[in-house]
Amino acid sequence: MHKLMWIIVWMGAAGLPLRAQVAPGAAAPGGAVPAYFIDGYHGGIYGHIPPWQTRFMVDKLHQYPDWKINLEIEPESWDTIARKYPADYDAFTGVLADPAMSDRVEYVNPTYAQSYLYNISGESIIRQFYYGMRKLREHFPGITFSTYSSEEPCFTSALPQLLLSYGFSYASLKNPNTCWGGYTRAFGGELVYWTGPDGSRLVTVPRYAVESLKPKSTWETIASNNSVAYITRSLKAGIRHPVGMCLQDAGWAGGPWVKPGKDHIPGTPGETNDIGTPYMPTVYETWKGYIEKRSIRVPGQVWHFTQEDVLVSLVWGGQVLQRIAQQVRVSENKIIATEKLAAMATIYSGAPWPGDPLDQAWRTLLLSQHHDCWIVPYNERSGVTWADNVVRWTGNTNRICDSVADAAMGVLSGAGGASDSVLVCVFNTTAVERAECVSFSLPNGWHSAEVLDSKGRRVPCQPGDSTQWLFLAHVPSMGYATYYAKRGFHPAPVAEAAGITRQQDGTYRIETDMYSLVVDPAKGGTIQNLVAKKLHHKEFAGVKCLGELRGNFYEQGGFHTSTETPADVRILENGPLRVRLEIRGRIAATPFAELLTLTEGQKRIDVHLDLDWAANTGIGASPDSVRGYPLKKAFYNDSFKLQALFPLSFQTPEVYKNAPFDVLHSHLSNTFFDSWDSIKNVVLLNWVDETDAKGAYGLGLFSDHTTSYAHGENYPLGLTIQYSGGGLFGRDYTIREATRLDYALVPHAGTWDKAGLWTEATLWNEPLRTRVFEGGAAAPARSLLHIDTAGWEISSLTYPGKDLDVRIFNAEGAAGPHRVYPGFAFRSVQLVSLAGRTIRALTPKKDVQGRTYLLLAMPRFGVRTLQFNEPFKQIDE
């Protein structure tokens, strides 16, 4: 990301000689202890890289024999450089291939698009590394990857196991010169064992406990220039080999970042406060060289690094960022489900694996996860903004996925036959068997349908909206089931039909087999009562109503709430399988519409929200409240933003929230801050959960996009809906269109893991799919994979070459060992790393019914990949 021009003051004249190398730990000739520095470049063709950058790096490496660089250049950049500047490209590849240069250049961030990582799915993180490393090896065949480091706060708690599985040995948690979007918590000394949620640990250079944020700055720490203050504080804290860092923006023309000067004299008055003078002597290193040759090598501390140690903030609720997050989430969900369907089609029907189209779909999804899309969405080049690119990139991913998925379902379903009936195939891309309400479009001329399962038994049905027809489907894990629909309407009975009634006091009561719920139009259509019938009739609503919209409309008199104006309520569907209630109200003169959906047997209560803004209006903290305070930003404090609030009946509640391949028990007393130097991690990736102090009951809140949540003492659980006001770099985040989003509520007993909350979120993100054919024939039901325990998730299915790779994530289950049942034959199977290295072969076993299974154990939050060699359909099918 482009820094502001005043940063150039640190860039002195080029061409001066650098400090000669000093032996590890030895004093320089003048007696000063040497410090170390990580220099290099950050950027790429999508971020910023000028035509001369490649040749510039080569020339400067030759000009300064003691200079070393660490690279964070977008891998796809090398395609363009090779095509447009072949001589420069050849010169650079020559440098990397030169044994004499092998310790002077290290590629420290090979991800495809330099994503923040904390804001995307775990599987997306895996593919960021996979595709990025693959691209770099196309250009630099002998390249190795030892250390992960980033100039931006591109960190997430689960990285240790992923990095180790890809063959990395080290990491750095510093980003001293680009902290606009945040930083990691200051902790520890020279080296720590960064310990992830699964127990994996990685040798890591942290942001030291003494590495403070730079005074009067909103983007730096005192390590960005190896300041005298930073190094002397580090030495006094017992850090024997202190190291600073700055990966310069590609395009900065100053060459080596820290310029030579006089050696520091220990004990100089004011040395611990001198943040402007670079410490001397400073020795340049790569991260690998520093850790292996300069540092203490063996960490003295173990750090159980959590997601709340990633102190980051973006303009959550800003409409442009909200749309980007939604578009990315849609594409993430689509591509994972599409790969699974394609794998089924390849194994069961012999369809070719669509590797090239899926690679292209992943490419554009990964680009849409670029950190600049999220932090500077309005920045543009040739009239095209990052936000515009996300629309284009995710659109491409979605088109490819829709085409591949449709083809796969078509191959699996079969076609042809009589036209007086239709074949309805229902596909499940998750690891659990499902019994859910699904819908399909009635054929032309049909007004109703009778649906039968593969054994000819009628199943419960219901008319949906328009030409949609609903029925209750039972589908095996990672597979599909077949149903037949005929003209007519003779539905099977429902044991406890869902329904809505309007009561004498004007409220609406919704009854399903799961819930009894009351909506009050007089209070803006909010939920007054929420009783979970199968949870000992627990009442979840507190004294105040659930689902109230509230925010500070600072141009319209301050705080407003949706309860100020009565709502119009209309019943859209009234059972027996599904009920839908439309709620239309107003907040601060802006009309909104909510669609409340409850389904028989479904734990989740779905809410779709539309806000039809007539014009841009300020929402959030008033600009006047932060004017004159450079560290303060109006978008930091979520309590002023428009939120959906859920005051529950719990006393002293606890909060849990998920992250990529992780769930965190929050230790925040509240989520509120208003200044750059006090950032908290309040990111809601997929869900946040509030439970009572005893862990007896809880309410999960799901979001259709990465955003923020609110919570605190005397402040209810809240979902950020909208912000309109000043953002980063002085940009105004405005409202330009209607706001449309989905969220869901899941009341539950026990803590999040006992309630299977991660699994519920996966079911929401990967809904059952239907494919309809007139007539036709197909196997009644198939299951490609089944796991004999709850809480294990199939993160992905891919079919590179002749092998099927099955990635499994232990989201909320026991460590095992557990049984994994493949629904296909295979030659052999092994456990492999993300890098493709065989860890060990697995021995198939048979259960008492003669079914093949594999035993697999992994810790909570562990990720494992099974590779099935030459899988094929069972011979007896």
Language-model-detected regions and their locations in the chain:
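N-terminal catalytic cores of secreted or lumenal carbohydrate-active enzymes
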Residues: 22-127, 136-139, 165-169, 310, ...
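Alpha-helical scaffolding within the catalytic cores
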Residues: 52-56, 83-100, 128, 179-198, ...
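C-terminal (or distal) subdomains of carbohydrate-active enzymes
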Residues: 8, 159-162, 398, 406, ...
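Alpha-helical scaffold elements lining the catalytic groove of polysaccharide deacetylases
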Residues: 116-138, 208-234, 579
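Bacterial Sec-dependent N-terminal signal peptides
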Residues: 1-28
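Catalytic domains of cell-wall/extracellular-matrix polysaccharide-remodeling enzymes
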Residues: 140-187, 252-262
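CE4/NodB-like, metal-dependent polysaccharide N-deacetylase domain
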Residues: 125-165, 226-246
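Active-site and substrate-binding clefts of carbohydrate-active enzymes
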Residues: 29-47, 188-418, 427-429, 454, ...
